[in-house]
Amino acid sequence: MTQTLPAGLTVTARVPASSANLGPGFDTLGIALGLYDEITVTTTASGLNIRVEGEGADDVPWGPSHLVVRAIERGLESAGVWADGLDVVCRNVIPHSRGLGSSASAVVGGLAAANGLAIKLDPELGLSLDQLVQLSSEFEGHPDNASASVLGGAVVSWSCAGEQADGAPAATDIYSAVALKVHPAIRVVALVPGERSSTAHTRGLLPETVPHRDAAFNVSRGALAVVALTERPDLLMAATEDRLHQTQRAPALPLTTRWIAVLRKAGIAATVSGAGPTVLALTTEPFPVELRAQAEAEGLQVLELDVADGVRTS
């Protein structure tokens, strides 16, 4: 039975950015980054009021089709509650369409806010972390970014076909993820270009098949990445090598590709962040001052970021 939330309940969700793939872990590996959007949701007597501040304020719809609103509604439905009206304020810091998981963060933040409202009504109605991973991944189609924003740290994610009770295929896959505790010596630097990238476009550049040797190469590097991230950061250079997607996307990301080469030549493990165009660098040393100056002179924003915890509500 659906319960109605009283007017006047307020929850704020603070949700981190994320980077997916980390080189070899295409659609599998992710990491939460210390760059945060905030979503404040208040239940009201009727209607929907939404306000967007910061990134995307002039680009996203201010209405029921907004991704955060859709995620809130899905979260309320999953928790078995309903609100007669909602006031939603989105304070966006994560750059949009740059490969930093802004859409996943919007979804996770909306779901977490809805979950927080349900818990205020009855703690027994709260959704588990596994449920939040599942729900957020359904929006995205794969859980690498979404699960990183839910769980924090680095994540290994996967999916499998779901089944109904009668054995027929389910309408959605089953999504899962486990969090990894990142080695404390690892530093994260994001080099963010001014231009945007389309995930759909860059995915369209990928071939339908790959040579067996390239698949085997990425399997080895993906396994090594787990070791490098948690225990052996000295292996990050080898652990971030890839043959499945970065070279294939290079024509669409010339600045990104060039900067990955520059950083790797300097001994810094660098990859495309998600679908780009942001460059993700993983290192155990301070980022070189001269490289920062060079990047900024070319219009790149250089962000030194912590590895973040997962979404939090208050």
From Swiss-Prot:
The keyword Kinase applies. Signal peptide: none annotated. ATP binds at P95, H96, S97, R98, G99, L100, G101, S102, S103, A104, S105. This is Homoserine kinase. Belongs to the GHMP kinase family. Homoserine kinase subfamily. GO terms for molecular function: ATP binding; homoserine kinase activity. Catalyzes the ATP-dependent phosphorylation of L-homoserine to L-homoserine phosphate. It is an enzyme of class 2 (transferase). Pathway: Amino-acid biosynthesis; L-threonine biosynthesis; L-threonine from L-aspartate: step 4/5. NCBIfam families: thrB (TIGR00191). It catalyses: L-homoserine + ATP = O-phospho-L-homoserine + ADP + H(+). Disulfide bonds: none annotated. InterPro entries: GHMP_kinase_C_dom, GHMP_kinase_C_sf, GHMP_kinase_N_dom, GHMP_knse_ATP-bd_CS, Homoserine_kinase, Ribosomal_Su5_D2-typ_SF, Ribsml_uS5_D2-typ_fold_subgr. It is found in: Cytoplasm. One of its GO terms (cellular component) is cytoplasm. GO terms for biological process: threonine biosynthetic process. Its EC number is 2.7.1.39. The keyword Translocase does not apply. SUPFAM superfamilies: GHMP Kinase, C-terminal domain, Ribosomal protein S5 domain 2-like. Keywords: Amino-acid biosynthesis, ATP-binding, Cytoplasm, Kinase, Nucleotide-binding, Threonine biosynthesis, Transferase.
